[in-house]
């Protein structure tokens, strides 16, 4: 009976470790949307604009500007954590 418990624990540990190794790693840092990319009508059109800029950008935000009826697309990118910046 004891060996059954040990084997069950071993299988559970192996399953948990494999799930952790397979799952995508979280990006260290925060998403900042501060690069203007022109005007937009919706978030989906802004995402399309920013995705054409390359791998450094991860979508975009369509934000209202100071002019009525005009929205500005801001492309988003990840900024490293403060610990990462200090190591540079």
Swiss-Prot record:
One GO BP on record is: defense response to fungus
One GO CC term, this protein: extracellular region
Q: Which UniProt keywords apply?
A: Antimicrobial, Disulfide bond, Fungicide, Plant defense, Secreted, Signal
The cysteines joined by S-S bonds are 33-76, 40-62, 46-73, 50-75
Q: Does the keyword Repressor apply?
A: no
Report the locations given in the UniProt record. Answer: Secreted
Q: Which domain of life is it from?
A: Eukaryota
What is this protein's name?
Defensin-like protein 98
Source species: Arabidopsis thaliana
Q: Give the classification, highest ranks.
A: Eukaryota, Viridiplantae, Streptophyta, Embryophyta, Tracheophyta
């Amino acid at each position: 009976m004891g060996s059954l418990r040990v084997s069950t624990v071993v299988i559970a540990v192996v399953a948990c470790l494999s799930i952790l190794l397979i799952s995508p790693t979280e990006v260290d840092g925060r998403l900042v949307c501060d690069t203007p990319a022109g005007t937009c009508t919706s978030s989906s059109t802004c995402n399309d604009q920013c995705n054409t800029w390359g791998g450094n950008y991860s979508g975009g935000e369509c934000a209202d500007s100071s002019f009525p009826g005009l929205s500005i697309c801001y492309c988003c990118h990840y900024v490293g954590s403060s610990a990462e910046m200090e190591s540079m």
